[in-house]
Design a protein with these regions (language model features):
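Surface "functional belts" at beta-alpha junctions
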Residues: 22, 34, 89-183, 198-201, ...
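Generic secondary-structure signature for well-ordered alpha-helical cores
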Residues: 48, 52, 193-200, 214
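Generic structural signal for well-ordered alpha-helical scaffold segments
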Residues: 44-51, 100-105, 153, 192
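Short, basic and Ser/Thr-rich N-terminal targeting/leader segments
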Residues: 9-12, 124, 202-203
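Short, flexible loop segments at boundaries between secondary-structure elements
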Residues: 182-195
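DPxDG-like acidic metal-binding loop motif
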Residues: 61-95
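N-terminal beta-alpha supersecondary unit
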Residues: 1-66
């Protein structure tokens, strides 16, 4: 298996190749406003570094967010287009879960510990979820949510916080540990483990949690009688 992973749910435009056991190559560019400019070059880069071609890729996994509308859409559309052109399956995986899995891979949290993943949702809000650490990995407790950082400060008090939200809203959260943005290598590793265990991955559908910031203008009333 050669798995192409793409995530654009955070400030990182992240791409990786995974052979089912190891990350072969990974690319990450930080730019919260220019996802569309970097994701395709990232794919070219990881294929070249791994000595592979697009024809070698057997499946694609895309981070489904939650994340800001425009950036998240770039990664998902790219993943679907690549998979369609190659006639291969495309899967989705929650980007918060990928960040949590990345934290576990880095041994940044301990067995039995609970922690929070919080990424930037703009408008002084975060996308967040709570996780427990088990011997086999991390387990999310409930669905991802979006909220003002200050509104969940009491609920998460005392818990380590992973993700860029911990930096942007440090006054609302506890100690920051682990990574800030999603690693496509961790996303690929999470997906590969789930597939190997016979678990069904979700479709590559975006998890927005709220309406986009940009909305179409209201229709003008006709001046004609």
């Amino acid at each position: 298996m050669l798995l192409l992973a793409i995530d654009t749910a955070t400030s990182a435009i992240a791409v990786a190749l995974h052979d089912g056991e190891h990350v072969l190559a990974e690319s990450s560019t930080l730019d919260a406003r220019r996802h569309g400019e970097y994701v395709a070059p990232g794919i070219v880069e990881v294929l070249a570094r791994a000595g592979r071609t697009a024809a070698d890729v057997s499946a694609v996994v895309a981070g489904t967010g939650p994340g800001p509308f425009t950036g998240l859409r770039v990664g998902l559309v790219t993943a679907r287009t690549f998979a369609f052109a190659r006639g291969i399956p495309v899967f989705g995986a929650c980007s918060l879960d990928a960040l949590a899995h990345q934290t576990w891979l880095q041994d940044a949290v301990e067995l039995g510990q609970s922690f929070v993943v919080a990424t930037d949702a703009r408008r002084k809000e975060v996308y967040w979820a709570r996780y427990d650490v088990t011997a086999g990995g991390v387990v999310r407790k409930g669905a991802p949510m979006v909220a003002k950082a200050e509104a969940i400060a009491e609920e998460v008090r005392g818990l380590p916080v992973i993700g860029r939200g911990a930096v942007l809203y440090a006054e609302s959260f506890g100690a920051r540990v682990g990574p800030l943005d999603v690693s496509a290598g961790a996303l690929a590793d999470l997906a590969a483990r789930m597939l190997a265990a016979g678990q069904q991955l979700p479709d590559a559908e975006p998890m927005y949690l709220r309406r986009p910031d940009a909305t179409p203008p209201p229709a003008r009333k006709s001046a004609l009688p």
